[in-house]
Amino acid sequence: MPYSADLDIRVTDSSLRDGSHAKRHQFTVEHVRSIVGALDAAGVPVIEVTHGDGLGGSSFNYGFSHTPEQELIKAAVETAERARIAFLMLPGLGVQSDIREAADNGASICRIATHCTEADISVQHFGLARELGLETVGFLMMSHSQPPEVLAKQARIMADAGCQCVYVVDSAGALILNAVSDRVSALVAELGDDAQVGFHGHENLGLGVANSVLAVEAGALQIDGSTRRFGAGAGNTPVEAFAAVTEKLGIRTGIDTLKIIDAAEDVVRPIMDGDCQLDRLSLMMGYAGVYSSFLKHADSHARRYGVSGAEILIEAGRRKLVGGQEDQLIEIALGLADRGPAGSAVAEKKSA
């Protein structure tokens, strides 16, 4: 069953939310207007805008925003002629008043994210969002860390709370092909007509587009990506590449492939501080199963304490750290510095 009469699937571009991690949360109103204008003209139906860690994320722990996110949401709403504006929030980091303010500023889609075993903390937030007339989307983050049957049960909690689409979220970019299909299929079977299923991928193992196509084949009706992979880690599924592939496969997204390719090169690329690429650290995140937004933090701590960023990430993966535990990366870096090269995480892994 297609997403709608006009679209087989709906694509959400996360460049102005997930890309905030790569930009170190330094987006300006001018950046938002430029990117939203280009994506809107290319036919992208939904554009997500907030701090990388969602509403209320501007903080010492996560990184301070250059411009208050509510101002960015306002600018996005004012600029978009067709696209709808979405926002992300993590319960406990963002609060209910943040949702109300985002709705007042014109955003119409509320995306609520929890760790994939903690869907219960989203219940009251979904209730509020539905009361406000917002469309609701749920994120089961770090979905690689749990088997399909566990994710399906967590998805049921979100759907029963009023969530209209539950996403398998590959926060670490660690899922490989059939692992995506199995998880999406499990959610589709559990939710039936009660809620749609979506997929959010990262490029940390170079599989963003392939995984997203497999998610669609397994029944996902909503897919996330970022233009020119503008996101955490190695970035998200590149919207321009996904648009080209889906066009060749006859999957209707409503996105003009040539226009989104131009937007990626002419508008988004100049705003990026550098390309989001598959390098040593981002590859290590997918390999070790580490939350993608840890990339900049691990790199900074590695430089500060004179240790290997890859070793920091391997240890973070061993500890199974999740979003919100960024402070432990400092502890890991200090431990590596104290132990020296002979006691490094890589050395221990090789000798095991």
From Swiss-Prot:
Annotated site residue numbers, Transition state stabilizer: 17
PROSITE patterns reported in the protein's UniProt record: PYR_CT
Active-site residues from the entry: 21 (proton acceptor)
UniProt: substrate binding residues: 17-18, 171, 200, 291
Gene3D superfamilies to which the protein is assigned, alphabetical: 1.10.8.60, Aldolase class I
GO molecular function term, any single one: 4-hydroxy-2-oxovalerate aldolase activity
UniProt cross-references to InterPro entries, sorted A to Z: 2-IPM_HCS-like, 4OH_2_O-val_aldolase, Aldolase_TIM, DmpG_comm, DRE_TIM_HOA, PYR_CT
GO process terms (BP): catabolic process; L-leucine biosynthetic process
UniProt catalytic activity: (S)-4-hydroxy-2-oxopentanoate = acetaldehyde + pyruvate
NCBIfam families: 4OH_2_O_val_ald (TIGR03217), PRK08195.1 (NF006049)
Protein name: 4-hydroxy-2-oxovalerate aldolase 4
